[in-house]
Amino acid sequence: VPATKPKSSLLASLFRTAPKPSTAPLQTRQEREFELINNFKTLGLAADDELSAAVYRSLYRVLGSIATTRGFLGNDPSYLCDICVRHACNYLGSREIGAKVGILVNKAIDAEGYDRIADAEIPILLSLKGASAAGKSSLRPMLSEMMAQLGIEEQGFGTISPDIWRRMLIDYDALGSVHKYAGRFSSHEVNIIDNKLDHYIRAKADSRQSIPHLMVDRFRFDSFASEKITRVLHRTYVRYIDTMYMYFVVTPPEATVERGWERGQVRGRYKAVEDFLGHCIEAYAGMPKLLFKWTSHKTPAYFFEFLDNSVPKGTYPLLIARGTQGKMQIYQLRSLIDIERYQRINVLATRPEEVAAPADQQQVANNLGFFKQCIKRFALIEFIDQQSETCFLAIRSGSFEVCDAALLQPNLTDDSLREMLAQLAPDLLSESSPR
């Protein structure tokens, strides 16, 4: 008969010494996996040959993405090995192909007698932002003229417009009756080129510690909405660009559909009406974000203009507003408010008159969100009389003040200005009313 274990007394159980904790607590599976992944990063940074660095880089990025998304790596090492090998080979292969293509490009430049774009001592970037078919490309002559005024020769700056690759990726003439869908057929490929171009600009700038003058003309959703461009190019621009000029092109959404159709007739690239209108919402919702993103930084020096492109083709757009960090001048309040109105359009419209939002949603009082943000973000906002180029009204640190009463009166015939004041500065409006 086995001996029975004597029972401990109540006092003994209450005052029993707690077991000593282990000096090295066991790691959870998740902790072990993340430690392993971080170790791959450390090994990659310390690697002294390109192959090892690429392998560790792929292990860190691929396994890190899986573990972050799923919470663990799973139990299929052969599958994980396969995708990491593919990732590393794609990375190394693309670099090798790029080096060989670079040799051919350099030979072609020499053979054709092209000029290489030199890095600039004080780099300037001009950027056009607007919805698809808003008329950005038609403004290039204006920007080229501005470059000349800044002392930059015609061949002294690079133009970034990846859309030209669509024509080179597809044989449009071979598409026959489906040629209107050509843009769709190459969308993913153009995105790949766009992304590679961003990385190329960054790598070249970091290598040379400089960057040439650039004119950027491209539409893409992440220009407004995502953080991808921030990760890839934002730091490059902040570090190397001295001055940035950004032009926001404001075009009525129904006009972009018409312009897009006419562009398709000439270039063979079409989009659905719904796509054009959807792009408008994306662009006009993103313009304020992009504006405030750059005005919140001290560098580079940042100059912006909002342009009303509802003018006949072949004529320069009208100035809506302009400014820099800390200051904004408004010439045409109605068009500035339109930026918010255009976010409410009907993407399923089948006729031009169906595009705009219902009348009650278009009232000034319901579309002051962007303007109120401007009041908070800019220390000084000036309203400029278009005839005399004189400031007649200012908002200084959120407070309205009349700068020229004689000029304010005729400008109050502008319904948008009067309704804005009725909402935000009713006392000033009543004081300015003729007695």
What are these regions (language model features)?
Residues L126-L150:
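Glycine-rich phosphate-binding P-loop
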Residues I152-H234, K271-E274, Y284:
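Conserved nucleotide-sensing/catalytic segment adjacent to the nucleotide-binding pocket
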Residues N106-A120:
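Pre-Walker A adenine-sensing motif
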Residues V238-W261:
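Conserved phosphate-donor/acceptor-positioning beta-strand/loop module used by diverse small-molecule
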Residues V1-V101:
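Long, basic/Gly/Ser/Thr-rich N-terminal segments
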Residues E121-L126, I211-P212:
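Pre-Walker A (Motif I) flank of P-loop NTPase domains
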Residues Q155-F157, R239-Y245, R267, T299-F303:
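Short glycine-/polar-rich loops that comprise or flank the Walker A/P-loop
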